Amino acid sequence: MSVFGKLFGAGGGKAGKGGPTPQEAIQRLRDTEEMLSKKQEFLEKKIEQELTAAKKHGTKNKRAALQALKRKKRYEKQLAQIDGTLSTIEFQREALENANTNTEVLKNMGYAAKAMKAAHDNMDIDKVDELMQDIADQQELAEEISTAISKPVGFGEEFDEDELMAELEELEQEELDKNLLEISGPETVPLPNVPSVALPSKPAKKKEEEDDDMKELENWAGSM
C-alpha cells in the first residue's frame, strides 16, 4: 500500500461518519512519519552497502562496480523523495496540532462563556444595586446597634454636668494650693517675748469677793 493510500484509506472505502477527528488524523500522520523514518534507515543502509560493493569491485570488475553505483543512485533518489515527504507531513501534522489546540481553546472558552451566562441569568444590574444597597443599610443598622449597646446608661442617675465640673475644679484648686503650701513650707509667726519679771498675782480683795459669792451660792442651794 502506498503512503498516501495508507494515509487517506485505500479502495475508496467509506469514511467514518462525520470524518476523522483531529486526534485520529494526528495519530495517522505520526504513524506515517515513523514508517518513513524506518524507510530512510533502510535506504541509508542500502546506499552504504552499494558504495562498499562499488569500492570492492573497483577496477577488477568494472561492470559490477557500475551496477552498484547505479543502485546507489536510485536509493539516494528515493531517500531524497522520502526526506521531502517527511518535511511535508511534519508541516501538516504541526498545522493540524495547532488547529486542534486552537479548537480546544475556543471550545473551552465557549464553555466558560456559557457557564458565565448561566450564572448571570438570574442577575441584572438593578438587582445588584438593590442588593448592595441592602447590604449597606444592614451595615449601617449594625453600627447603630453597636453604638447603642456600647453607650453607658445612667439607670435614672441624672447629674448636672456644670455642677460636677465646678466641684471638680474646686477639688483641683484645693490640691494645687496644698501642693504649693508643701513646696513653700509653713509661714513662721513671731512669738511674744517671755516676761523677765514675775506677773502680779490677783488682788486679795478680789479673791475675798469671789469667796463670798461662793458661800452665798452654797447657802442658797442648801435652803432649797
Swiss-Prot record:
The modification Phosphoserine is found at residues 184, 223. The modification N-acetylserine is found at residue 2. Pfam families: Snf7. InterPro entries: Snf7_fam (IPR005024). Probable core component of the endosomal sorting required for transport complex III (ESCRT-III) which is involved in multivesicular bodies (MVBs) formation and sorting of endosomal cargo proteins into MVBs. MVBs contain intraluminal vesicles (ILVs) that are generated by invagination and scission from the limiting membrane of the endosome and mostly are delivered to lysosomes enabling degradation of membrane proteins, such as stimulated growth factor receptors, lysosomal enzymes and lipids. The MVB pathway appears to require the sequential function of ESCRT-O, -I,-II and -III complexes. The acidic C-terminus and the basic N-termminus are thought to render the protein in a closed, soluble and inactive conformation through an autoinhibitory intramolecular interaction. The open and active conformation, which enables membrane binding and oligomerization, is achieved by interaction with other cellular binding partners, probably including other ESCRT components. This is Charged multivesicular body protein 4b. The lineage of its organism: Eukaryota, Metazoa, Chordata, Craniata, Vertebrata.
